[in-house]
């Protein structure tokens, strides 16, 4: 089962947290639609800013958005001008008070979304898929990953028939729930059509903290 299921969804509540931190009964559909609009808007607006994840929290008429990016300077802008413009645009989009928090990604080579985007951009630039995948995987392993697996599907190198090619280095234990595995799917748009790029990165194990018992010895 671990081979088929989304590794992030499988680990939510165990070693991963939700990217949307709110609860609603009557307004659930409206909030979910708004979340999708926010994520789509940020993805288009900050397409060159290496944005990995967007976390959304809600409280009354306020929306707190945490943007995880490898290029915080590009998102913030000179004197905070860019992030202020983004906040105003999101205010108009949602009709709510929006607060934006920028979180820097210290090691972009260990982030599955950014690694996948890197491979996708190379494929769009007509780099051979094997070269793009292997070069990126070696850089990720040098950055401290325990293992990485990449998969590209579509009309590779402009072939008439679409196929799937995958490569792996190190270990990627998909069944181990305490294994910190980052997963992402990215699309590359080439002259021959769209290619799907999947990335799994194993960053080590996250062990649950042992609870200390305050009980005294004896019966």
UniProtKB/Swiss-Prot annotation:
* Keyword Magnesium part of the UniProt annotation: no
Q: Name one GO cellular component term.
A: cytosolic small ribosomal subunit
Q: Which GO terms describe its biological process?
A: translation
Q: Where is the KH type-2 domain?
A: 38-106
Q: What is a single Pfam family found in this protein's UniProt entry?
A: KH_2
Assigned keywords, A-Z: Ribonucleoprotein, Ribosomal protein, RNA-binding, rRNA-binding
Q: Does the keyword Ribosomal protein apply?
A: yes
CDD domains registered for this protein in UniProt? KH-II_30S_S3
Question: Cross-referenced Gene3D superfamilies, in alphabetical order?
Answer: 3.30.300.20, Ribosomal protein S3, C-terminal domain
Subunit info here reads:
Part of the 30S ribosomal subunit. Forms a tight complex with proteins S10 and S14.
Q: What does this protein do?
A: Binds the lower part of the 30S subunit head. Binds mRNA in the 70S ribosome, positioning it for translation.
Name of the protein in its database record: Small ribosomal subunit protein uS3
Q: Which organism is it from?
A: Levilactobacillus brevis (strain ATCC 367 / BCRC 12310 / CIP 105137 / JCM 1170 / LMG 11437 / NCIMB 947 / NCTC 947)
């Amino acid at each position: 089962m671990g081979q088929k299921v989304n590794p992030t969804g499988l680990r939510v509540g165990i070693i991963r947290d939700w990217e949307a931190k709110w609860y609603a009964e009557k307004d659930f559909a409206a909030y979910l639609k708004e979340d999708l609009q926010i994520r789509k808007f940020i993805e288009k607006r900050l397409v060159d800013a290496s944005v990995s994840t967007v976390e959304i929290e809600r409280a009354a008429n306020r929306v707190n958005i945490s943007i995880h990016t490898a290029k915080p300077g590009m998102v913030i802008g000179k004197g905070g001008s860019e992030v202020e413009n983004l906040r105003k645009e999101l205010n108009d989009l949602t009709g709510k008070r929006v607060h934006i928090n920028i979180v820097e990604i210290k090691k972009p080579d260990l982030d599955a979304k950014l690694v996948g985007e890197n491979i996708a951009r190379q494929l769009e630039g007509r780099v051979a898929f094997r070269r793009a995948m292997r070069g990126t995987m070696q850089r990720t392993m040098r950055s401290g990953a325990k293992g990485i697996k990449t998969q590209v599907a579509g009309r590779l190198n402009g072939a008439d028939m679409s196929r799937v090619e995958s490569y792996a280095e190190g270990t990627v234990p998909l069944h181990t729930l305490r294994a910190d595995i980052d997963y992402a799917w990215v699309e590359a748009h080439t002259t021959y059509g769209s290619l799907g790029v999947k990335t799994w990165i194993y960053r080590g194990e996250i062990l649950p903290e042992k609870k200390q018992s305050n009980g005294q010895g004896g019966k």
